Amino acid sequence: MILVLLMVILMMIFIVQSIAFITLYERHLLGSSQNRLGPTKVTFMGLAQALLDGVKLLKKEQMTPLNSSEVSFLLVPGISFVVMYLEWFTLPYFFDFISFEYSVLFFLCLIGFSVYTTLISGIVSKSKYGMIGAIRASSQSISYEIAFSLYVLCIIIHNNVFNFVSKFNLSLLIIYIPFLIMVIAELNRAPFDFSEGERELVRGFNVEFARVAFVLLFLSEYGSLIFFSVLSSAMFFKFSIFMAFSIFSLLIFIRSSYPRYRYDLMMSLFWFKLLPISLIMLCFYAVIFYY
């Protein structure tokens, strides 16, 4: 029991430390894409930039809006962080000390629940910008989650288990591109970052959050980004650090290269293109592996 608790604490420290350096890496890549250096002034090559940014955030003042509560401002980001943290326990072969049989179903429950934290955070902020961002995130989640679940079901049929299996699946590569598009939508990253549209929503659902609350939302966002990079590497390419790093870099380059998609085109893409493709692929894998 003590060993399991120690492993859980160490994993949390590992995730937080990874986020600190991954954000620095993202800023350098975004700087390179725009022909600038990125953060390089704080210590050697800017390595302490993320740590000092965190200290600066914690020193900010939290202004709680009228008709809202301070408890909800900490509770909702805390739940968001816990959901992100629980996602890591579904990874294959990495955390066997608490592994369980139906990790894929647990994973689908978590990503379905994660949108509620975004919705509630927009509601408790008592801001029209936060509310619009939360509604956008909810409608976006409804549009892609059905197709995303069907793609995950294709993986279950292929592997014949309800766990994520870490191996190189050549026959699964045909669904990797639509799966990656769904992952980008799940992460609310560009070009599907409608819940955080700066031009029309200031900051989106988290516009009123600061200090610890904003840090928890930030950690949950980038923790999920790292998680999906590792998960994609494990499911499609037999997990390697290089492939996980490459997928993460690809997600950053997509952010730096593509403008925000139009909202109606995003809905059309998920409902009229990716959803029918997911149904066809599900039937294809069912026929191939069961008949």
From Swiss-Prot:
PROSITE patterns: COMPLEX1_ND1_1, COMPLEX1_ND1_2. Coiled coil: none annotated. One of its GO terms (molecular function) is NADH dehydrogenase (ubiquinone) activity. It is a multi-pass membrane protein. It catalyses: a ubiquinone + NADH + 5 H(+)(in) = a ubiquinol + NAD(+) + 4 H(+)(out). The keyword Translocase applies. The chain crosses the membrane at residues 2-22, 71-91, 104-124, 142-162, 164-184, 212-232, 234-254, 269-289. Its EC number is 7.1.1.2. InterPro entries: NADH_UbQ_OxRdtase_su1/FPO (IPR001694), NADH_UbQ_OxRdtase_su1_CS (IPR018086). It holds the Pfam family NADHdh. It is found in: Mitochondrion inner membrane. One of its GO terms (biological process) is aerobic respiration. GO terms for cellular component: mitochondrial inner membrane; respiratory chain complex I. Keywords: Electron transport, Membrane, Mitochondrion, Mitochondrion inner membrane, NAD, Respiratory chain, Translocase, Transmembrane, Transmembrane helix, Transport, Ubiquinone. Core subunit of the mitochondrial membrane respiratory chain NADH dehydrogenase (Complex I) that is believed to belong to the minimal assembly required for catalysis. Complex I functions in the transfer of electrons from NADH to the respiratory chain. The immediate electron acceptor for the enzyme is believed to be ubiquinone. Belongs to the complex I subunit 1 family. This is NADH-ubiquinone oxidoreductase chain 1.
